[in-house]
Amino acid sequence: MALAATAVALLPLGYLLLRTAEGGLASWWETVATERVARLTATSLSLAVVVTVACLVIGVGSAWLVTRSNTPGRAPLAVLLALPLAVPSYVAAFTWVSVSDLWSGDPSARFEGFGAAALVLTLYTYPYVYLPVAAALARVDPSQEEVARSLGRGPWRTLLTVTLPQVRPAIAGGGLLAALYVLADFGAVSILRLDTFTRAIFTALSSGFNRSMALTLATVLVLLTLGILWGEGRTRRAGARFSTASVSRPATPLDLGPWRFVGTGALVVVVLTALGVPALSLARWMAAGSSAGQAWDRIGDAAWGSLSASLLGALLTVALALPVGLLAARHPGRLSALLERAAYLAHALPGVVVGLSLVFFGVTVALPLYQTTWLLALAYASLFLPLAVAAVASAAAQAPPSLEEAAQSLGSSPARVFTRVTLPLTLPGIGAGAALVFLTAMKELPATLLLRPTGMDTLATRLWSATGIGRYAEAAPYALLLVALAAVPTWVVVRRTGIVPAGSGAPRSDRSVPTATAPAPAEPVVSP
Amino acid sequence: MIRVTRLALVGALLPLTLAACGPTEEPAPASDGGTADTAESGAESDGTLTLYSGRNEELVQPVLDDFTSETGIEVEIRYADTAAMAAQLLEEGENSPADAFLAQDAGALGAVSAEGLLQDLPQETLDLVPDTYESADGTWVGLTGRSRVLAYNTQAVSEDELPASVQELTGPEWTGRVGVAPTNASFQSFVTAMRVLEGEDAAATWLADLAANDPQIREKNGEIVADVDSGAIDAGLVNHYYLYELAAEKGVAPEELDVALHFFPGGDTGALVNISGMGLVGEQADGDAQALVDYLLSEAGQTYFVEQTSEYPMIEGLEGPAGLPALKDLETPDIDLNDLEDLQTTISMITEAGLL
């Protein structure tokens, strides 16, 4: 099973090697060893580093604030903080440009370049860190922290030396996802005019239809990814930690005193800048244009297309991610690490390259599947497998293997141990992974355009079509519905993963009845 | 169902023969005088065809609907960027489900044709369109014409300030005022035309001077026209019809906008007329795709483009879009679109100049 998943992830890579091998090593080297490639490498890597660091700060900080502190308003904020993930980067970047144009009279001071790209990518990528870290923090057993506190460690030292190390797999996994997302992103960097690898790949394809140039550049992107994976692997070497209790109970929120309002303020600033700017722009588009009415006739079909394709993609991805994630968490070793890492390789490739590789796979190997929703779902699995693998692995790393061993020693079959012990314990992680894949698939564009069944629309393709000729008023309803639909699974997952106490609207009640609201992840949370 | 079975069979066999995939088979000899219905297999229409459209759905869906109600032939349509669509066609090769390719520019049709994926069109079809606007080997025809123009803000640029040539735009009086879209195929075709007409060195110099003149770079033509209208940019190099799309989106008459069009005079490269066009993909089992080409080049089809997308018609005897100079009155540069194939050199030159 794990091998099958790896094969899916490696499909685009195989295609890349096949295609670039046709040209030969000499011509590959000739394309790669240029000043431009060096510049692209520097830009792409710096952007990835800057955005990842910023994502870690915002993601870990906000996750800690909503799960472990008494910051007022943390229950609604916990949900809102995940929402920027629902905004496609191309929509985000475009709305930022159009809002900044309102203020800037000087066209040369346009909102573009490295800083702009770093800001926009951070604001819409940090949930890759926030979601898994918050889910992990909500599940981590607080007893070690309580011991540390009772032995006289201050709250900050406890946070740094006890709490954060326990969720380190989630932090590292989230950071890795953010870094790879930045490498693969096309929408934001192209609108904000920053020359990265992905933009160069698109340019090679779109101008001159130069596939060999595009694919050669993509192989360099794979090498960069390998470097990042290697670097991230080194930070993990200390090994996974397992919590000791089977079902965690919520930690007692830390009283921040007056600082709690600063915490709320910081979270509100993040949410407002990330969601407010697109909201403002979309409202302006709706008001200014005349084409909005045209969206309403077709929005239902497009929504159905988005939901069905993304749901199928999420199910397939999670099914493939489960064995890889469990293997990586339960049997750490060279092989499982290799399999897990392989899942990440396609994630840093731009959607158009993965799309083309599946076009090739479709017409040469799986023709009956070509231009069906199944092949599109396979593309989503190929692109987004790491989102689910990271979620499963970090959930499994926190579920103590001692429980499985106990079940086995009591005579349960491995299959029964899996369904009765392992699966329930990792379900919140699986749910979060499924939702991440679902959300990301909903906004995916280049591969969707290449692989969707002829005549099928999604909200993202309709959005693309409307903005393609400047019909922003028509685009606005699609963008709004895309975000609204994506908000539903986000909300469910935030509740189910225990970031916000389930069944309780009042965040403070968990202090008075700490055990009553303990999440009991016994029912499947595959995908809402 | 028949198609699915056939595709499944090919799918099963293809991995075996993949290595042998060499140059594609020559299409059947062009029928001289034979109509499309009798050409090839001569099969009856099955009432459906698959069209890959690199043109925007909002722009072409209505005329495709007209075609269906006129002929009863259903059109299965895939929409994507012209470039992505060309890449997809090239990747699909002979297994492509497409029957026809509708592209936004001649370059994409040329790239697909160069791989032998397009069929020869019958002479009657080619005869409808001026030689300048069709493929030299008869594998694609232009459906509409679009002219390069300078869109300018009527408040910021006076008429006597308008340049006689794109060459002037690199001068100090235009510093920081000109919008360009270097990633756009239409800009690249125009630069290719400059290379062909004025030589590599002249084109490289122009690009370097332009880049040094602090141009306003945008991703798309539409953004340039909108920014010229809003006054964020004074002028920009675009295709002529974006102004009409902006007017439609704002719900006003084109004259009410603050942006107007300047057609470069005297055969200047800046007045290049390019096309959107169509080619037939792969073996034609029946004449359905040909029927679509026929319809789009009929008076009804061409009138649609003139009135709804404000593009120039390709057939004789039709007036151009209202309010625009007639196609024959445009002082276009003397160039054959077939000479604009070498995009790679253009792209590396644009990249070298620092515009990409």
Language-model region placement:
Chain B
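C-terminal motif of bacterial Sec signal peptides marking the signal peptidase cleavage site
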Residues: 16-20
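Early extracytoplasmic/lumenal segment of secretory-pathway proteins
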Residues: 22-23, 37, 42-110, 356
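Extracytoplasmic ligand-binding site segments that recognize negatively charged/polar headgroups
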Residues: 54-61, 80-84, 96-233, 269
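A ligand-binding cleft/hinge motif common to bilobed small-molecule-binding domains
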Residues: 107-111, 235-258
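Periplasmic-binding protein-like
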Residues: 146, 177-182, 207-211, 217-218, 255-282, 295-318
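A bilobed periplasmic-binding-protein/Venus flytrap-type ligand-binding module shared by bacterial periplasmic
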Residues: 149-156, 195, 273-287, 295, ...
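An extracytoplasmic/periplasmic, membrane-proximal ligand-sensing/linker region
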Residues: 201-203, 311-356
